[in-house]
Amino acid sequence: MSPHPTALLGLVLCLAQTIHTQEEDLPRPSISAEPGTVIPLGSHVTFVCRGPVGVQTFRLERDSRSTYNDTEDVSQASPSESEARFRIDSVREGNAGLYRCIYYKPPKWSEQSDYLELLVKESSGGPDSPDTEPGSSAGPTQRPSDNSHNEHAPASQGLKAEHLYILIGVSVVFLFCLLLLVLFCLHRQNQIKQGPPRSKDEEQKPQQRPDLAVDVLERTADKATVNGLPEKDRETDTSALAAGSSQEVTYAQLDHWALTQRTARAVSPQSTKPMAESITYAAVARH
């Protein structure tokens, strides 16, 4: 069988392995706030999102994706880490809430980071203020990840898996159709080599037609010969039959001209030139 189906199957398996590798989970990003998570009203705050090298877009989400902000201004924080910064110049009471990060590294989006809660309070100006000192970085607040919000992601991981299954299914169907086509071609080639089953019968039919024509002409010539007997010959035959004893004698008239011309008439029926009549009688005894 042709090696093409085997090569195509190997190509499909390699493609499936590549897609499966791309489907591996990306590391979760991290989020932090500078100068801290408790910010006086009117002050500034910067959210820092970090992820692996090769991130194309970082997204800062607030309150379970109800509000988000994307940025492609990604810098490399270390040889194995990249980051993006989201700054709020003047914090208001409406800025308080839960924040988390997510990043896009082709061809998929990562999981969400842990939640970070930002608190906004009125500035008291006292030395014992519980505000976070400038320059400090507060860690994220641990909250259970809400997987129900994944439906809003621009690129769904479930769709990627469905695409992989569809690709594998289409490849299997294509290989099956290709196999059927190869089998059909082989079967057709064998039929061409053997020839059609009725070709021999059809070749014999034209050869039988001249034989049938010759038989018809022979029967017609025999009838004409018998009918051409003169009345005297017929009477002689009748008297000979009556005078015979226990044996019966039958006379047969042989027309040499008719016998010699049968084949010629079958080949060229237009030749009607009369020839000398030659008749021979033969006595046949019937017991």
Swiss-Prot record:
The modification Phosphotyrosine is found at residues 251, 281. GO terms for cellular component: plasma membrane; specific granule membrane; tertiary granule membrane. Keywords: Adaptive immunity, Cell membrane, Disulfide bond, Glycoprotein, Immunity, Immunoglobulin domain, Membrane, Phosphoprotein, Receptor, Signal, Transmembrane, Transmembrane helix. This is Leukocyte-associated immunoglobulin-like receptor 1. Residues 198-208 have a biased composition (Basic and acidic residues). Residues 29-117 form the Ig-like C2-type domain. A motif (ITIM motif 1) lies at residues 249-254. Functions as an inhibitory receptor that plays a constitutive negative regulatory role on cytolytic function of natural killer (NK) cells, B-cells and T-cells. Activation by Tyr phosphorylation results in recruitment and activation of the phosphatases PTPN6 and PTPN11. It also reduces the increase of intracellular calcium evoked by B-cell receptor ligation. May also play its inhibitory role independently of SH2-containing phosphatases. Modulates cytokine production in CD4+ T-cells, down-regulating IL2 and IFNG production while inducing secretion of transforming growth factor beta. Residues 187-287 are cytoplasmic.
